[in-house]
């Protein structure tokens, strides 16, 4: 009803303005043609008789019930005509009834209404102006700084050191040309606490033995199957990115080669390895980068109540050392600061790490976002924290969330204050002030919001009011708990969802809701104010046209009249358009100079009912009276609403009909200025990154596999090949034999081992040389050459035995047999036979030579037999020398030159 009233009021104002405008335009455009007595008009008698033509117009005049020709419309409205042309009106235009039928055919839904005068039985009044609503807004909008925390899914990481000994026992069968492993036993043994502290950390050495328990039996493994010694730790061959390592040996010990026997060899490799360790909430165990689990809390110890932490091992397997100075096994440098060192022995290894207290080393929450501008608004029973920077809205309760309920949440307050102070100093220090202390709220999805309210410096006087409001939101019991109560207070771990989409959707909904509510609020306010303004116009317009105002108000056609400050209304009766006939003249024949201001009509309530005379009112109203009279004026032009169109009367006579489309429409609507929803781009926002999700697990399988596959490369020499030596057993036996004889035996052993080694090397060299084809050929040639030399030596010995002089002096004997010197032959002839003295001397010399040879043989045999034989030989030598000195004289040398010439 209010909407209809508003439309009616606007139409009334517009039509009033339009009527005044058209009147002015018509008056200014109409030509002045006074003295037009022959105006052609068809009038109808008061009893409703047929219309008759006016006299001075020649020809028959159209009657009132003449039907207009169908589909005959003027192309353009005819211009105003002077009064003298009234005779041509009937001939130049179609009859009124034909035009009316055209209008009725085009607008079959146009109805007419007969409105009886109201009697006052029903009266109405207008509603008083209403109080317009205010725009819906959130309560207590507050700006501030926020730090959003999420669940910390990252594990607690720390450095640990592993001490263990790799024990390898290999069984080898040696053949003549090959070796075969019959079995390899590998095990890992822990390093005792004393060895870790007194040997490895103090001196950088490790024992060559491994003592450990397997199957409840204590066993000991000896490196190289030898006595216990200290072995130097050396850096590993290949270090990883996150750890270092040291070990004592690169090569596996294999037993000495003894063909056709099974031999065993033991290798003990002491390994010290720095590894990364991880532990996740509730920190009851941790795992090493090698994949080994330790079922003890990394915070277990004997200090500050840490003995209450979880452990699955016996007490004698754990040791805590205060004032421990770690040593770098590569540089041998000692740490400058002492630490508290935890040591734990497991069946496979010993692990050590620096002990730290649980608080504040770990925290179950971590900082996610720092928001410079966070708007907090109150909707119903919740707070909504919205930020355009991250396109997110968080919903929380109105009460703060106490940090004491967060298990291991010591880092929250410190990190939040540091971030807020940094943001405030950078951005708000000169324009805003802080309101109270940071507040903490638990949002949906497991996000903890640390919020610092801010106030502009211009609103500083409102600080007290805001502070009081904040105090009302504090928990019911803000007093600090008594000592010891925190231990009994229930704590919880906040679980944060891995998706932020719900907060993004909440932000989108709030963004749209805020825009729509603001828009609808403005529309509601404008509508209410417009209604109040129009109500004043309606109150004034009802005095001018109560029928139109009443019809627009009640939403249907009624008749009304003012009864003081109220209106009396009556319901109008609809009349079909086919039962209404308009007459073609508006002049009153009985009263010259008087004319009707509205066209006259005849109508029937029903199709076969009696004809009723009346007058056409406004908006297709059929008035039962004909009292709308005005003085006739010159240049009269009027447009009257008739059915679905208009009828045009000129000089109080019908001219032609027009449709509504032929009249220019002036809009009375007020444009509604609605701001379109602005574009908003969502930025990618992740609660947990891929790296955080990947790193959240307790065990990094990639790191474990990488370390396991690098173990042999780091702590073993995979390139060196040891060939089995058959003489190794002999050398090992000789070495062990001489080692048991003390220092002198070791000295002698070195000499003997050197000689034996040389012999073995020579034999090995010969064997290697013989195995070469070229060497075998060379040896064959040498053998043939040796046989040839032996043959010639044998021949020489045989000749020496048969004829020594000929063998010793072949040339001399040859010259004696065949003399070539003539002088010698002559002298021989003169001299005759050989000199007997010289022959005797020669015989004597030969005899003494034989004697000397016999004496030397006797002395040599006496040396072999003993001391008595040696004395006998000496006495014999003295006798022979004495005898030789008395009987032997030197042969004169005076004939030497002659003898030489003779020879």
Swiss-Prot record:
Membrane side Virion surface: residue ranges: 30-773
Residues of this chain annotated as glycosylated in UniProt: 86, 140, 397, 429, 488, 673
Localization of this protein: Virion membrane; Host cell membrane; Host endosome membrane; Host Golgi apparatus membrane
Regions of compositional bias (Pro residues) in chain numbering: 52-61, 475-484
Subunit organization: Homotrimer; disulfide-linked. Interacts with host receptor MYH9/NMMHC-IIA. Interacts with host receptor MYH10/NMMHC-IIB. Interacts with the host coreceptor PILRA. Binds to heparan sulfate proteoglycans. Interacts with gH/gL heterodimer. Interacts with gD.
Function according to Swiss-Prot or TrEMBL: Envelope glycoprotein that forms spikes at the surface of virion envelope and binds to the host cell entry receptors MYH9/NMMHC-IIA and MYH10/NMMHC-IIB, promoting the virus entry into host cells. Essential for the initial attachment to heparan sulfate moieties of the host cell surface proteoglycans. Involved in fusion of viral and cellular membranes leading to virus entry into the host cell: following initial binding to its host cell entry receptors, membrane fusion is mediated by the fusion machinery composed at least of gB and the heterodimer gH/gL.
Reported modifications of this chain: The cytoplasmic tail is phosphorylated by the viral kinase US3. Phosphorylation may be linked to a down-regulation of gB expression on cell surface.
TM spans (from-to): 774-794
Any one of the GO BP annotations: symbiont entry into host cell
Chief place where the protein resides: virion
High-level lineage: Viruses, Duplodnaviria, Heunggongvirae, Peploviricota, Herviviricetes
Recorded GO MF terms: receptor ligand activity
Alphabetized SUPFAM superfamilies for the sequence: Viral glycoprotein ectodomain-like
Family membership: Belongs to the herpesviridae glycoprotein B family.
Membrane topology listed for this record: Single-pass type I membrane protein
Annotated motif Internalization motif, positions: 888-891
UniProt protein name: Envelope glycoprotein B
Alphabetized InterPro entries for the sequence: Glycoprot_B_PH1, Glycoprot_B_PH2, Glycoprot_B_PH2_sf, Glycoprotein_B_ecto_C, Herpes_Glycoprot_B
Organism for this UniProt entry: Human herpesvirus 1 (strain F) (HHV-1)
Pfam family, one: Glycoprotein_B
Region (Disordered): 30-87, 469-491, 882-903
Segments on the Intravirion side according to the record's topology features: 795-903
């Amino acid at each position: 009803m209010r909407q209809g009233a508003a439309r009616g009021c606007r139409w009334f104002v517009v039509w009033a303005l339009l009527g005044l405008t058209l009147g002015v335009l018509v008056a200014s455009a109409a030509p002045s043609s006074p003295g037009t007595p022959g105006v052609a008009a068809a009038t109808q008698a008061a009893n409703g008789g047929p219309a008759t033509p006016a006299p001075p117009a020649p020809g028959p005049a159209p009657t009132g019930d003449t039907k207009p020709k169908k589909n005959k419309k003027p192309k353009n409205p005819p211009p105003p005509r002077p009064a003298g042309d009234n005779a041509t009106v009937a001939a130049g235009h179609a009859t009124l009834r034909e035009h009316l039928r055209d209008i009725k055919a085009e607008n079959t839904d146009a109805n007419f209404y007969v409105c009886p005068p109201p009697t006052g039985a029903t009266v109405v009044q207008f509603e008083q102006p209403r109080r317009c609503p205010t725009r819906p807004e959130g309560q207590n909008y507050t700006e501030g700084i926020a730090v959003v925390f999420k669940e910390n899914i990252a594990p607690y990481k720390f450095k640990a050191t592993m001490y263990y000994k790799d024990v390898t026992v290999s069984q080898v069968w040696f053949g003549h040309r090959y070796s075969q492993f019959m079995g390899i036993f590998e095990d890992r043994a822990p390093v005792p606490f004393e060895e870790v502290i007194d040997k490895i950390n103090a001196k950088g050495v490790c024992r060559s033995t491994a003592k450990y328990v397997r199957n409840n039996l204590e066993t000991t493994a000896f490196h190289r199957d030898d006595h216990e010694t200290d072995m130097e730790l050396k850096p590993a061959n290949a270090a990883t990115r996150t750890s270092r390592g040291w070990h004592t040996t690169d090569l596996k010990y294999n037993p000495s080669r003894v063909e056709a026997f099974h031999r065993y060899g033991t290798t003990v490799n002491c390994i010290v390895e720095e590894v990364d360790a991880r532990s996740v909430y509730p920190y009851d165990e941790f795992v090493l980068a090698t994949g080994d689990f330790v079922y003890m809390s990394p915070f277990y110890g004997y200090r500050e109540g840490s003995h209450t932490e979880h452990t699955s091992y016996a007490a004698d397997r754990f040791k805590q050392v205060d004032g421990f100075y770690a040593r770098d096994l590569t540089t041998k440098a000692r740490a400058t600061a002492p630490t508290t060192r935890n040591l734990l022995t497991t069946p496979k290894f010993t692990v050590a790490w620096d002990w730290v207290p649980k608080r504040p080393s770990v925290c179950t929450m971590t900082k996610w976002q720092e928001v410079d501008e966070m708007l907090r608004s109150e909707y119903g029973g919740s707070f909504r924290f919205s930020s355009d920077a991250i396109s997110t809205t968080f919903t929380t309760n109105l009460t703060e969330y106490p940090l004491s309920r967060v298990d291991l949440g010591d880092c929250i307050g410190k990190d939040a204050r540091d971030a807020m102070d940094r943001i405030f100093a950078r951005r708000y220090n000169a324009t805003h002030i802080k309101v109270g202390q940071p507040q903490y709220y638990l949002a949906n999805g497991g996000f903890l919001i640390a919020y610092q309210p801010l106030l502009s410096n211009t609103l500083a006087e409102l600080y007290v009011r805001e502070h009081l409001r904040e105090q009302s939101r504090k928990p019911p019991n803000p007093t600090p708990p008594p000592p010891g109560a925190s231990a009994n207070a229930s704590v919880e771990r906040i679980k944060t969802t891995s998706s932020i989409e719900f907060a993004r959707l909440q932000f989108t909904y709030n963004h749209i809701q805020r825009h729509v509510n603001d828009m609808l609020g403005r529309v509601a306010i404008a509508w209410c104010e417009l209604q109040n303004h129009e109500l004043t116009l309606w109150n004034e317009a009802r005095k001018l046209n109560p029928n139109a105002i009443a019809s627009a108000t009640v939403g249907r056609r009624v008749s009304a009249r003012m009864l003081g400050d109220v209106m009396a209304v009556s319901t109008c009766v609809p009349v079909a358009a086919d039962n209404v006939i308009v007459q073609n003249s508006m002049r009153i024949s009985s009263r010259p100079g008087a004319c009707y201001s509205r066209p006259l009509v005849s109508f029937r309530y029903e199709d076969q009912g009696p004809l009723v005379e009346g007058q056409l009112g406004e908006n297709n109203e059929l008035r039962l009276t004909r009292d709308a009279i005005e003085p006739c004026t010159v240049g009269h032009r009027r447009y009257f609403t008739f059915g679905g169109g208009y009828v045009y009367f000129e000089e109080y006579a019908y001219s032609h009909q027009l449709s509504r489309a032929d009249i220019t429409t002036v809009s009375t609507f007020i444009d509604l200025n609605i701001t379109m929803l602005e574009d908003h781009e969502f930025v990618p926002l992740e609660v947990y990154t891929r790296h955080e999700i990947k790193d959240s697990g307790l065990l990094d399988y990639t790191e474990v596999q990488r370390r396991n596959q690098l173990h042999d490369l780091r702590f073993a020499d995979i390139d060196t090949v040891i060939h089995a030596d058959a003489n190794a057993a002999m050398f090992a036996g000789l070495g062990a034999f001489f080692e048991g004889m003390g220092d002198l035996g070791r000295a002698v052993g070195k000499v003997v081992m050197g000689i034996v080694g040389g012999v073995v090397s020579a034999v090995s060299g010969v064997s290697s040389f013989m195995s070469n084809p070229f060497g075998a050929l060379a040896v064959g040639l040498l053998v043939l050459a040796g046989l040839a030399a032996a043959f010639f030596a044998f021949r020489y010995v045989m000749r020496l035995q048969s004829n020594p002089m000929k063998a010793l002096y072949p040339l001399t004997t040859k010259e004696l047999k065949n003399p070539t010197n003539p002088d010698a032959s002559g002298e021989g002839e003169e001299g005759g036979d050989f000199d007997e003295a010289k022959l005797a001397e020669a015989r004597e010399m030969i005899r003494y030579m034989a004697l000397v040879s016999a004496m030397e043989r006797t002395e040599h045999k006496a040396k072999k037999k003993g001391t008595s034989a040696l004395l006998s030989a000496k006495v014999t030598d003295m006798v022979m020398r004495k005898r030789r000195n008395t009987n032997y004289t030197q042969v004169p040398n005076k004939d030497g030159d002659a003898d030489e010439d003779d020879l």
